[in-house]
Curated annotation (Swiss-Prot):
Keyword S-adenosyl-L-methionine: yes
Enzyme Commission code(s) on record: 2.1.1.172
Compartment(s): Cytoplasm
Taxon lineage: Bacteria, Pseudomonadati, Pseudomonadota, Gammaproteobacteria, Pasteurellales
Gene that encodes the chain: rsmC
Protein's UniProt name: Ribosomal RNA small subunit methyltransferase C
Organism: Actinobacillus pleuropneumoniae serotype 7 (strain AP76)
């Protein structure tokens, strides 16, 4: 099934004929298969591991270094993430480079005109399926300084670092704050700890600083989050392993504690698939007596999921908006 963006691209198949093609950005389907027959070659790059892991021909990472005669960028909902990815890629190609940018209007794709105008000619060439399609030709190669995109803030004795589109990138969010408040020195936490959906590394770094003896693993699907967590650990001289994983897809160990402020937004829609998988599979990933501890908006239907997977659960903290749930193996 094609995304709305790819449906618009199918109206312009002659543009892909006999050219090397790169698809990158928020690619979420197999439009590549639609153009392979007529294109010279097709490469796909994604910064999202949940998509990339499904297909052997999709490259995953933070920096896209793949060159192509025609690049197609799928706009994401985060303008700064788009700016980062577009300028990073354009900084390494030559004047005359062609690019198509496709995105949903509600995701703010119109702002690509202002973003890319300083670097070349951009024009809207189609509008359909509530999407806009733009053609861009590079005339002035941009300078890309990745350092300018970093944000940082102080959290007690920690320095937190984050790239665009990473959750809790500018300040500590209320849910994570409530979750962290449930840990104290008296817990004497030890053993293997997994911070799943680590974002900027706030939870994992806080626990590692408080409980030095834990063996910390942090995971996320987003390359920008993984890089953010690595830097947060490094800047605070903390040890930990950071891995790309779609829930438990790339994790084989068992843990004494799995802790998470799990995402329930997918792009600009709400989705629960990752959280459902987390709760359903967590018990099998815990050592005997191990604990799953998560924070969530109070309105979300997690109690039933926890009871189904674990048999019971406890609410160990709550506020007007959030609840912290604990379930033990």
């Amino acid at each position: 099934m094609l995304s709305l963006e790819s449906e618009v691209l199918t109206r312009h198949l002659p543009l892909f004929a006999n050219k090397s093609i790169l698809l990158f950005g928020d690619v979420r389907d197999r439009f590549a298969d639609q153009i392979k027959a007529n294109a010279k070659s097709v490469a796909v790059f994604s910064s999202y591991f949940d998509y990339a892991r499904q297909y052997a021909d999709v490259s995953f990472g933070l920096y896209c270094e793949i060159k192509a005669e025609l690049a197609v960028f799928y706009w994401t909902k985060n303008k700064q993430e788009c700016q980062y990815q577009l300028l990073q890629w354009l900084s390494q190609v030559d004047v005359g480079q062609e690019m198509l940018i496709i995105g949903e209007n509600r995701a703010g794709v119109r702002s690509v005109e202002k973003l890319l105008e300083p670097y070349g000619n951009i024009a809207k060439i189609d509008s359909a399926r509530r999407c806009g399609l733009y053609h861009f030709e590079l005339q002035s190669v941009p300078d890309f300084d990745g350092k300018k995109f970093w944000k940082s803030y102080r959290l007690q004795d920690l320095n937190i670092f984050a790239l665009p589109a990473v959750f809790s990138s500018a300040e500590l969010d209320d849910g994570t704050q409530l979750l962290l408040s449930t840990f104290n020195k008296a817990d004497r936490l030890k053993g293997k700890v997994l911070d799943l959906g680590c974002g900027a590394g706030v939870i994992g770094a806080s626990l590692k600083q408080q409980f030095e003896k834990i063996k910390l693993t942090m995971s996320d699907i987003h390359a920008m989050a993984l890089e953010s967590s690595r830097r947060t650990l490094a800047e605070n001289a903390l040890d930990g392993t950071v891995v790309a994983s779609d829930v438990f897809s790339n994790i084989e160990e068992r843990f004494d504690l799995i802790v998470s402020n799990p995402p329930f937004h997918d792009g600009i829609d709400t989705a629960y698939r990752a959280v459902e998988d987390l709760i359903a599979q967590a018990k099998q990933r815990l050592n005997r007596g191990g604990e799953l501890r998560i924070v969530a908006n109070a309105f979300l239907p997690y109690p039933d999921l926890l009871d189904k997977a674990f048999g019971s659960h406890q609410v160990i903290a709550k506020s007007n908006k959030f609840k912290v749930y604990s379930a033990k193996a």
